[in-house]
Amino acid sequence: MSYSYAEKKRIRKEFGVLPHILDVPYLLSIQTESYKKFLTVDAAKGRLHSGLEIVLKQSFPVESKNGQYELHYVDYQIGEPTFDETECQVRGATYDAPLNVKLRLVVYNKDALPNEKIVEDIREEYVYMGDIPLMTTNGTFIINGTERVVVSQLHRSPGAFFSKDDSEEGAFSARIIPYRGSWLDFEFDSKGIIWARIDRKRKFCATVILKALGYTQEQILENFSESKTITFNSKGFALRLDNLSNMKGELLKFDIVDAQDNVIVKKNKKLTSRDVKKIKDAGVDSVAIDFDLVSTLRVAKDIVNEATGEVIAYANDDVTESLLKSCVEVGMLELEVIDFITTERGRYISDTLKYDLTRNTDEALVEIYKVLRPGDPPAAASVKALFEGLFFIESRYSLSDIGRMKLNARLGSDKVSKDIYTLENSDIVGVIEELINIRDGKGKVDDIDHLGNRRVRSVGEMVENQFRIGLYRVEKGIRESMSLVHKDKLMPKDIVNSKPITAAIKEFFTSGALSQFMDQDNPLSEVTHKRRISALGPGGLSRDRAGFEVRDVHATHYGRLCPIETPEGPNIGLINSLASYARVNDYGFLEAPYRKVVDGKVTDEIEYLSAIDEDNYVIAQASTKLDENNHFVEDIIQCRSGGEAIFTESSRVQYMDVSAKQMVSAAAALIPFLEHDDANRVLMGANMQRQAVPTLKSEKPLVGTGMEKIVARDSGNCIIARNVGEVAEVDSNRIVIKVDTEKSQTSNLVDIYSLTKFKRSNKNTCINQRPIVNVGDKVEAGDILADGFATDFGELSLGHNLMVAFMPWNGYNFEDSILLSERIVKDDKYTSIHIEEFTCVARDTKLGPEEITADIPNVSESSLAKLDESGIVHIGANVEAGDILVAKITPKAEQQLTPEERLLRAIFNEKASNVVDSSLRMPSGTSGTVINVQVFENDKGGKSKRALKIEKELIDKARKDFDEEFAVIESVVKSSIEQEVVGAKIQKAKGLKKGAILTKEFLATLPLSKWLEISFEDEKLEEKVQNAREYYEEAKIAIDAKFEAKKKSITQSNELSPGVLKTVKVFVAIKKRIQPGDKMAGRHGNKGVVSRVLPVEDMPYMEDGTPVDVCLNPLGIPSRMNIGQILEAHLGLASYGLGKKIEKTLEKTRKAAELRKTLEEVYNSVGDKKVNLEALNDEEILTLCDNLKGGVPIATPVFDGAKEEDIKSLLKIGGFATNGQMKLFDGRTGKPFDRHVTVGYMYMLKLDHLVDDKMHARSTGSYSLVTQQPLGGKAQFGGQRFGEMEVWALQAYGAAYTLREMLTVKSDDIAGRSKMYKNIVDGKLTMNVDVPESFNVLRNEVRALGIDMDFDYSSEEE
């Protein structure tokens, strides 16, 4: 096995017995693939079914009302974005590109005859159709400078669905759901009548729809019911027994007798195949029935007197005595009736027709019109147009390819072509037929929670729908413009207004429910947010109406949606996460991968199955035992089939799971020993990992699952090598790789990677990249070159490994509290940097412009000390709460001054009397260091000194960066050709003769540009130098072009909002150490709050003097049932012990041979998966050992982790007791504790619930206008509410004076509180109480009801 650059530095020992079959697919593909499909930029690759292409093709051509103009779509192009991703974030712009559509305007001769079209002119041009947001490489969008994610939606798939309402007997219903257009419902009531609804409006008889489709009453009956023939004569009535085989399984309502009156089949018996044979053998072709039975029947077809043409009875009329007489009179002795005798099937439609008062198609169309447009007078043309527009015109109604496929599959017919997206008559007839079958018990209702009936709508599809909405509005505008614009040479751009498209897309990205502010606490929260699948949003469910069933875990979730990761609270089960290996197919259905089983042998062939396909197969678990030939070891194995867990013969198995972790999401797959935890706690563990704050120093988990490197790689926070090569240069800002062109598919000689430094994330955490390679290191494509935030050697590192003791300590771990050692604070283990952004905006007001200036009235010099001459804080300044960040003045209205004030003003020349200080100040409770300032100004007033200074610094930095980049390219080109050309014969060179040998000394005197002008006799060498020359010149041009583009973007004017003159952004870095009140958690849902930070000397310690880092309450485990944390602690202790063993070996010797022996014991003595140490050279072995001193990292994959025996064996090798317990001593007394304590290493996280963000105190502040009570909440700088329950508590204690103080002067007694303040100032300790303002509010509200209530000031004595 080969190891990557980062893996060689620190190999993770892997447990788990299952073979590695399939790599976890790229975690962000659900976002990137979907948008790529929507935005096929490369026309050469074909845009046949790409999103934009298909929408444009469906919307065009557009024809003018008079038929003179036709606008056709030809092609589209997407331009280059104005700014790159970083620039957009800085400027608060949207990362988008212009969409230019090539349109062809065909002009016809207006004088030509109506039916013939003579083309007069064709005009083509590209028309700007708005800006389309582009997706960044990490699957996000930058909208107005903030990074956003569009969450995928799980919604009901288009198609036909059948359901049952349990509240009513026989209440079955069918619904045809299109991709866009009107919904059509059919439903049974308790009487067996079939009703229809369009768009959930008023119901009407289902047969009205059929008549509107053109069916007659006779045809409707023929389609939905069997008919039987009755003969009658003087002896009575007889029923012909035609199609006996169709009667199988039906209940007989009469005896069947033969010619000798022997009963062959008795009444009230279900007819069997044997009975049918008996009847045929006896030659019985008809059976006598009585009039009572005949009178329940109805006529199947119109009965017409052939002689006169008179209609005796219509189809569906009841068979009555008078009807029979009329038939006899005209010589008709047989009658075709609807078969209610042998089956009830025909009665539903027959009864419905009885309720249906319409007689023909026109009446049916009018009835539908009245339902949909009540109050509108029905005109013949509009009635027909309305009905056709509902289901039969593709621009208004579309099932889409998904809906057509589902509808055909559900009705079990392929009569309708897959390319027809509107409804056909056979679809509607088929749905009603299936509904009748279900009512008769011959079909099954659908499970709407089955993932075969729910599909994922990803970002590309949602933007496509928004684009379609915008384009529909544009289309209407084009039609109007064609008839209004009168121009000699009309061009496409004269009649196209693209604003509706821009508006529709902007609305979706800025205010759509599924376009969300990216969760950017750490790399895992980013990845999880992009893989989230929500059932909420437009066209989805609402959390208030969603029941238990839709939220519950369904059997089809297996391998598709994670059964664990979902929010707690009202959204539980409605927001899910994609499982590790799941993917979305072309139809939007979720698929899971399986290994194919052929003739009892498990192959490595992978097939993805959707939930619909999976129902038909028997699937074995990933942990099923196989022999060396991949055959099943056991004859009876546990499998899944049709959503049930079953035991079955191994010969029946058709597929097998790919991996044990395929059923859980990426976040759940990061939890070691997940299989030993209760699901509720795992849910908390998975959710809390997303809230972990990245710390100053990242540390890998000693006990991981092997998923850490996959999440870190796919999150896009690490820098990954694009090509094979050697590290040429490294510093904190960039990494330069000299590319090995022979092993890489690129002509670039150099790859330069710029690192992100101290950038603010969406959650105010700090994004910073650190290189992990050194100059001279050889790297392969895909190797990690630099760690991002919360990653360590390319592995996700959300927290730190701490030595944990499960023991109580003086009540400081009561109720999940956590006792921490001071060492953790000293070592900055959980110190995190948070970057806050403060914005100051200078606007143009009615009274004049606001001004950002250092000249502020009534502010001391010391307050302005940290500002520059422009009134903006210096970079590097340490700012405290209340310090001015940006000094700003706002004009105020002129006041009438007294003569004395005017005199004083004149004497002291005070000009700033008519302005008020509106500076941006540091909020309370925060302090930090200013790390960056950005100034944005509009062009009108010219640029300020600070803005010009920042601009100059940015241009200088860019010039320096590009110069250095070019210098690197020069040195790489030099070194690549120097070895080849030294000693070669010259063809032509300035200063040397032809045929001379080129020396190193001669080259040293020339610049590289002159080197490349030398020509050589050797053709191959000449070609190589020619290639280097071309590359060098191209690189020079490219770098100059890049610099000019960068310079242009830096100096380009800023588009500020209307009325805004200047915007200043100040970024302050705040360092937060861990302290009591901060929330911490493990990965098993074991969360708690830090109760105390204890000096190291007081912490319990081991026999060798090592103090523990954390004391956790052992009572927090039994009731929570998250035993995984105990196993993690044991395995973590073993890992620590192995690290100590390696450290001791290193202290004795640094010989590679000795170290290899120790590593062999550590890595390969326990567990099935071995580490190939032979793949590492001696130097790599030494580096590996140095990196393992703190502990050997271990991977224990979920559902395939380390067993108890493995942990015990490792503890033994590490030099610890196999029960993981040890004697601890009290740090304060030095005495041992009574019993041995479980001690181990656990990975603990600091969560983004920091006490600094929550603690808040107020003495004075703002009041509510109406009640005059202090505001509430930290954001409003509010007070502490003294609510009803607190008042009752004081009442219960009889604390009258305290209560009076709380309800009056400390709250809303305006006069009282002012007097109280005055008394305190004067040193008087008395309290004057007046009426609280809230009483006045109550009094006024009561007065509004017409009741005069007032306060009685008189005392009882009076």
Swiss-Prot record:
GO terms for cellular component: DNA-directed RNA polymerase complex. PROSITE patterns: RNA_POL_BETA. Transmembrane segments: none annotated. SUPFAM superfamilies: beta and beta-prime subunits of DNA dependent RNA-polymerase. Keywords: DNA-directed RNA polymerase, Nucleotidyltransferase, Transcription, Transferase. Coiled coil: none annotated. Gene3D superfamilies: 2.40.50.100, 2.40.50.150, 3.90.1100.10, DNA-directed RNA polymerase, beta subunit, external 1 domain, DNA-directed RNA polymerase, subunit 2, domain 6, RNA polymerase alpha subunit dimerisation domain, RNA polymerase Rpb2, domain 2. One of its GO terms (molecular function) is ribonucleoside binding. DNA-dependent RNA polymerase catalyzes the transcription of DNA into RNA using the four ribonucleoside triphosphates as substrates. The RNAP catalytic core consists of 2 alpha, 1 beta, 1 beta' and 1 omega subunit. When a sigma factor is associated with the core the holoenzyme is formed, which can initiate transcription. Belongs to the RNA polymerase beta chain family. This is DNA-directed RNA polymerase subunit beta. It comes from Francisella tularensis subsp. holarctica (strain LVS).
